[in-house]
Every structure is written in C-alpha cells, then in structure tokens.
From Swiss-Prot:
This is Photosystem II CP43 reaction center protein. Pfam families: PSII. Belongs to the PsbB/PsbC family. PsbC subfamily. One of its GO terms (cellular component) is photosystem II. It comes from the Eukaryota. The chain crosses the membrane at residues 69-93, 134-155, 178-200, 255-275, 291-312, 447-471. The modification N-acetylthreonine is found at residue 15. The modification Phosphothreonine is found at residue 15. HAMAP family: PSII_PsbC_CP43. It comes from Anthoceros angustus (Hornwort). Residues 1-14 form a propeptide. GO terms for molecular function: chlorophyll binding; electron transporter, transferring electrons within the cyclic electron transport pathway of photosynthesis activity; metal ion binding. It is a multi-pass membrane protein. SUPFAM superfamilies: Photosystem II antenna protein-like. The lineage of its organism: Eukaryota, Viridiplantae, Streptophyta, Embryophyta, Anthocerotophyta.
Length: 473
C-alpha cells in the first residue's frame, strides 16, 4: 500500500523518492530506509535494535573466545609471546594470570578458562540476539517501559547515559580489585626483571593523578601516556571509577539543563555520532599508549617499544666493546660526539649515536644503571647484570617495526628476527580504526545536523539496481 502522507514527520532523515522495495515487513516505505542502510531500518523499533546490538556483542565475544583458544593451542612456552604473533594472551598475562618472575609463562590453564568462558558467554548473547531479532516484541515501550525509549525523550536519554557511566565505573573497579585483592597484576618494574604483585599502596593524590592530564603531550612529558608505575595506573582507575559512577548517578537523577537541550541535537543519529567521536579519541589514545608505554603494556609480552629497541642496541654494543677493552666514557664517534655515551640537551649522560633521539626512554632493564645525572659511568663499568644483557640483546633484535608480509625488525639490522611486533599491530590497528571512526563521526554528525535543520533529502533511488531484481519474498 502506498503511504498517502509525508513520512517526513516521523523519519526526518530521508525523504523517499520511491518505496517499492519490500523486505520482511521492514521495507523502505514503512521505515524510510533501504535494505542497505542496515540498522537504520530499526531506528524506531527498540526491540529489534536491541536484538541487533545483543547479536553484535555475541559476535565480538565469540571472536574473543575463539581467538583466545586459537592462541592457547598455538602457544609455545619457550618463545616470548611477542615472537608468536599473540595479541590476546599478552593482555591476560599483564593481568597477572599464568605468569611468574620475568614474565615467564608457568601455567596456560587460566588462558584456556578465559577462552571457554568467552565462548559460553557468546552463546548466551547469540541466543538473546536471535530471540530479540526474530521472536521478541518489535518495540519495548509497551511491554517493558523501563527498557523502552523514544530518541527525542531527553530525560530518558540522559538516564541511559547515566546507566552506561555506572557500568563503566564498575568496570574500572574490576581492575582495581584484581590488582589489589585478587592475585595482583604483572609489574614489569618489580626488582630483578618483573613479577606479579598485588598493588596495595595506590596513588590517590588528585594532584598526581590529574597532573597527568595537564602535562604536555610531547617529548619526555607524554601526557597520560607517560605513566610509569602501577600505583598511579590503579589509583587512576579508582578515580575514574568514582567519577564515572558519581557522574552516572547524576545523569540518572537529573534532567538535562536548558543550555544542553538547546545546544545538542537529540536524535538517534546524533547519539551515534557522539559515540563514534568518543571512540575515535579512545582509539588514538590507545594507539599512543601501546606504542610508547611499557608499564601498562609490558615489553616481556608485547615486545619492546621503538625507543626501547633502539636504546637496547646501543646498550648491547656498549657491553660488547667495553669487554673488548674500549673506554666507553671517552670513545669518540664518527661525528665527533661520544660513540657510546654523550650528554643530553639538559646535561644528563645518555647513549650516543642515532639512539640519542630516544634519550628519555625509561625501561626496567636500564633504570638500575642510572645515577643522579643520567647513566652512571661506574655502574656501567661494574654493575651490569647478566639479565640486563640478555634482555637488551633480545629487545635489540625485536624492534616493533615491520610490514604486512612479516619481514620485521630494523631493515639494517643483520641479527633481526623475521616477525612483526604485536605493538605494531595494536598501535596501527587502533590508529586506523580511530581514523575511520572519526570519519564516521563527521558523516553521522553532518546527517544528524542536516536532519535537525530540515534539509536532508536522501538519495534518488530510481536507478538503484535492486529495484529491477526479483523481490526476495
């Protein structure tokens, strides 16, 4: 049946040029969207949209469980995780499961349990997704008013925002409890080369925690990415958890103020654009975190950072040549600067050569050799431990550089290993996803603003190929 009145009133985003394509009751005519617009057809069907989201969560959790078990099945305890292309087990190891001193894996059973739990969860979510997509009510407003909503209902929207914030806050506290009471987490800075320990002396000083937000993002400052101890990381999660929970309660109990009602666009597509913008920012921050930070992402599991691999090479050859009789304190390099050691712009003693650009690296295998003014010459001559030599030689040959065809490491390094670091994968993937989510944010924000202003026309579908095909039903 042709609709005789304008759908504009109900579906402000697209005005239809034609509505002849029918698809299982969710056709163009009744929804204002063609089949390829995906979940847009479900904008006003809260029950079916719930099904789509639950099913999507099921797919995500299924991937996590299946990939987790795949990594367990292929895991070789004798090789470091980062040499085996693992991206999930390093996260579990960082949480303190299955590892001992030096990041050595002593038990893979917790990893197996994690995979199985995710698979079971995905089955429950998958069932819920199928149920709500095919069997459950199309809309929740009538039968389950608590779970129902209308996109324009500003008070309900901020209540939903509040519930999400409370859940995020509880998630932050899960990490706090794991680190402080349930077996601890892996600390790469533990003496002697890293170990699992419970974090009991949390940093709760607001000047320290919020001081990170005020730091410059550049150089040795590094904004929040510069955090280099677990006390600050776990203490930061206490603050995050409190802020999210209190903010969530605030949004549940209050209605949006007049300025917010005026300033924001209140539609499903607008909320989508806000979310995409936020996730984009998180993606870019995660990219920098995994690339530069070796405390939250320990090098024992993820491989060295770029600066770390470079400094490790300088250290390795300093050790070798010192054994061969070189005076590393005074040897001159080809440019007239120190060959092994030189001074930073602010006077600290640092490694010489090309790695001078990474002079503000901090790493657990190197810090014991520093004194009050940079690297300590007497410690370099007398205090270097075998574990520091072994680790730096290992990191030197596993720089987080590489291409998709797995020719990894520094192009000029003859001892490099044929691998690509998980750091490269995680940093690159989060950068690329952050970028695409940003583009999605711009796209949906533009459409939402246009719809609110009332001039979104849609696409002329007269020549759409699917219109000349046999209907599916």
């Amino acid at each position: 049946m042709k609709t005789l009145y304008s759908l504009r009133r109900y579906y402000p985003v697209e005005t239809l040029f034609n509505g002849t394509l029918a698809l299982g009751g969710r056709d163009q005519e009744t929804t204002g969207f063609a089949w390829w617009a995906g979940n847009a057809r479900l904008i006003n069907l809260s029950g079916k949209l719930l099904g789509a989201h639950v099913a999507h969560a099921g797919l995500i959790v299924f991937w996590a469980g299946a990939m987790n078990l795949f990594e367990v099945a292929h895991f070789v305890p004798e090789k470091p995780m980062y040499e085996q292309g693992l991206i999930l087990l390093p996260h579990l190891a960082t949480l303190g499961w299955g590892v001992g001193p030096g990041g050595e894996v002593i038990d893979t059973f917790p990893y197996f349990v994690s995979g199985v739990l995710h698979l079971i969860s995905s089955a429950v979510l998958g069932f819920g997704g199928i149920y709500h997509s095919l069997i459950g009510p199309e809309t929740l407003e009538e039968s389950f008013p608590f779970f129902g909503y209308v996109w324009k209902d500003k008070n309900k929207m901020t209540t939903i925002l509040g519930i999400h914030l409370v859940l995020l806050g509880l998630g932050a506290f899960l990490l706090v409890f794991k680190a402080s009471f349930f077996g601890g987490v892996y600390d790469t800075w533990a003496p002697g080369g890293g170990d699992v320990r419970e974090i009991t002396n949390l940093t709760l000083s607001p000047s320290i925690i919020f001081g990170y937000l005020l730091k410059s993002p550049f150089g040795g400052e590094g904004w929040i990415v510069s955090v280099d101890n677990l006390e600050d990381i776990i203490g930061g999660h206490v603050w995050l958890g409190l802020i999210c929970i209190l903010g969530g309660i605030w949004h549940i109990l209050t209605k949006p103020f007049a300025w917010a009602r005026r300033a924001l666009v209140w539609s499903g597509e607008a909320y989508l654009s806000y979310s995409l913008g936020a996730i984009s920012v998180f993606g870019f921050i995660a990219c920098c975190f995994v690339w530069f930070n070796n405390t939250a992402y320990p090098s024992e599991f993820y491989g060295p950072t770029g600066p770390e691999a470079s400094q490790a090479q300088a250290f390795t050859f300093l050790v070798r040549d010192q054994r061969l009789g070189a005076n590393v304190g005074s040897a001159q390099g080809p440019t007239g600067l120190g060959k092994y050691l030189m001074r930073s712009p602010t006077g600290e003693i640092i490694f010489g050569g090309e790695t001078m650009r990474f002079w503000d690296l901090r790493a657990p295998w190197l810090e014991p050799l520093r004194g009050p003014n940079g690297l300590d010459l007497s410690k370099l001559k007398q205090d270097i431990q075998p574990w520091q030599e072994r680790r730096s030689a290992e990191y030197m040959t596993h720089a987080p550089l590489g291409s998709l065809n797995s020719v990894g490491g520094v192009a000029t390094e003859i001892n490099a290993v044929n691998y690509v670091s998980p750091r490269s994968w995680l940093a690159t993937s989060h950068f690329v996803l952050g970028f695409f989510f940003f583009v999605g944010h711009l796209w949906h924000a533009g459409r939402a603003r246009a719809a609110a202003a009332g001039f979104e026309k849609g696409i002329d579908r007269d020549s759409e190929p699917v219109l000349s095909m046999t209907p599916l039903n």
